[in-house]
Design a protein with these regions (language model features):
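Sec-dependent N-terminal signal peptides
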Residues: 4-15
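A short beta-strand-turn-helix
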Residues: 17-18, 105-125
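N-terminal targeting signals for Sec/Tat export/insertion, comprising classic cleavable signal peptides
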Residues: 23-70, 77
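Short pre-active-site segment immediately N-terminal to redox-active cysteine/selenocysteine motifs
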Residues: 25-28, 123-126, 130-134, 180
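Typically the conserved alpha-helix immediately C-terminal to a functionally engaged Cys/Sec
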Residues: 37-43, 137-151
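Thiol-based oxidoreductase modules, predominantly thioredoxin-like and allied folds used
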Residues: 51-57, 130, 153-168
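Non-catalytic, surface beta->alpha helical segment in thiol-disulfide oxidoreductase systems
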Residues: 73-76, 180, 186-214
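N-proximal helix/coil linker or "cap" segments that precede and/or mark the start of modular domains
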Residues: 77-106
Length: 214
């Protein structure tokens, strides 16, 4: 009887045959470890999650035959991405155009200052993003935010192009205190200003969004 119980327990336990280590795209500081770990730990079948922020890697135990696409999806929903052994990707890739069109994103040319009260999305956390096409970090942050929005429909983005720091949107951003790009201002679901983020550090962006959702 005892031997049978041991056998049943063994059969019921998942067979963790594989340990997978892979690059996590988007880790830019030690504070990124908790959201990466949380995202990976949420995937069914994943155990023993370890994140190395210096090497920008994650290591997980998964069952034999596990679909690694689930890891990438979980990271994407948290604003990160994954590069598995054999792949050659260095940056977070933009979403397909049809998916981007389904997100609550409105772009403004920056020729006029934004009427903040009018552009905010009622009932949603709204990020007002002052950006420029020549700003590389702005483009990376844009892709991260769009991926994050896929799993967070309560989020909206209003993007204002500051040109070459020479238009109305640029003057407005400067008035708000922007000293560099990317520059975000986060508002809660009631339209109350919560926080600003300069530089696009992802842990700070996530913290601002979380604060707005309280």
């Amino acid at each position: 009887m005892k031997r049978s119980l041991i056998l049943l327990a063994f059969l019921a336990a998942p067979l963790f045959a594989d340990t997978v280590t892979f690059k996590v795209i988007g880790i830019d500081c030690a504070s990124c470890a908790p959201p990466v770990k949380k995202a990976l730990a949420s995937v069914s079948g994943v155990t023993n999650v370890k994140v190395d922020t210096e090497a920008k890697t994650a290591t997980v135990d998964v069952p034999s035959g596990f679909d690694k696409a689930k890891l990438r999806e979980a990271l994407s929903n948290a604003g990160f991405d994954a590069t598995f052994p054999g792949e050659k990707r260095a940056d977070i890739e933009p979403l397909p155009a049809d998916i981007v069109k389904s997100l609550d994103i409105v772009r403004y040319d920056g020729k006029s200052a934004l009427d903040i009260g009018k552009v905010l999305a009622h009932g949603k956390i709204t990020i007002v993003d002052y950006y420029a096409g020549w700003c590389g970090p702005c483009n990376v942050l844009e892709s991260r935010l769009e991926r994050y929005m896929v799993a967070h429909p309560d989020l909206a983005i209003r993007r204002a192009d500051i040109g070459k720091w020479n238009n109305a949107a640029a003057a407005q951003a400067t008035h708000f205190g922007a000293e560099a790009l990317p520059y975000l201002r986060v508002y809660d679901t009631h339209g109350k200003f919560v926080a600003s983020v300069t530089g696009g550090m992802w842990d700070e962006v996530l913290a601002a969004i979380e604060k707005a959702g309280r």
